[in-house]
């Protein structure tokens, strides 16, 4: 099993993505793959995995740290790269969709899935209401606990605050991916799960 050697909120929720990988997965895509840790973990479950990221620094890190058979890294903007339609069994993104047009990214991810393929997203949204802020309160002690027992470190990937609220993310996801399952998680993250008809 690939171990991270570090902890942060994104690494914490990688199991949510990994548990969404369909049995017998042949091809998987990690959108905005960063340092490639999730790509390496996906390669334990899929015959072939592609990681794409537009940051040359992150792709260089991914290639240096995660190079192995069955893994391909592409340095490009996901929304511009000409992947073939319906070419993946599994497409995922871990806390990266707020760096791009959210609806365009979900639409592109869905287009790349084969019928029956699975989509999984871990995302970040903005607290824009009292309800959002109250829902985030339990995350504070939980975050302190995790930081005390794990070695927290960022991957070096660019960081950006989200624009969309939790409600806006949920509404846009439901409109773009009918039947999508949305869930808000403890440490300031949400997940989306969807199977292409």
Positions of predicted regions on the chain:
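A short, conserved alpha-helix within the catalytic core of class I
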Residues: 100-109
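Conserved beta-strand signature within the Rossmann-like core of class I S-adenosyl-L-methionine
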Residues: 116-123
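C-terminal alpha-helical "lid/dimerization" subdomain adjacent to the S-adenosyl-L-methionine
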Residues: 125-172
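A conserved beta-strand element that flanks and buttresses the S-adenosyl-L-methionine
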Residues: 92
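Class I SAM-dependent methyltransferase SAM/SAH-binding core
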Residues: 35-37, 41-80
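Conserved Class I S-adenosyl-L-methionine
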Residues: 159-197
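Conserved class I S-adenosyl-L-methionine
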Residues: 26-34
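Conserved alpha-helix/loop element of class I SAM-dependent methyltransferases that forms part
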Residues: 8-26
């Amino acid at each position: 099993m690939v171990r991270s050697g570090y902890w942060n909120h994104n690494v914490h929720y990688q199991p949510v993505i990994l548990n969404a990988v369909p049995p017998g997965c042949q091809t998987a895509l990690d959108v905005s793959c960063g340092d490639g840790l999730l790509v390496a973990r996906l390669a334990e479950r899929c015959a072939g995995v592609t990681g794409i990221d537009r940051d040359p620094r992150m792709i260089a890190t991914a290639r240096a740290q995660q190079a192995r058979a069955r893994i391909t890294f592409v340095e490009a903007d996901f929304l511009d790269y000409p992947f073939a339609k319906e070419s993946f069994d599994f497409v995922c993104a871990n806390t990266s969709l707020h760096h791009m047009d959210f609806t365009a990214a979900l639409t592109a991810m869905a287009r790349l899935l084969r019928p029956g393929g699975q989509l999984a997203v871990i995302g970040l949204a903005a607290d824009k209401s009292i309800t959002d802020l109250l829902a985030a309160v339990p995350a504070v002690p939980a975050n302190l606990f995790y930081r005390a027992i794990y070695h927290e470190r960022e991957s070096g990937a660019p960081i950006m605050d989200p624009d969309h609220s939790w409600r806006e993310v949920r509404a846009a996801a439901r409109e773009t991916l009918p039947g999508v399952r949305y869930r808000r998680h403890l440490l300031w993250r949400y997940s989306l799960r969807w199977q292409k008809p």
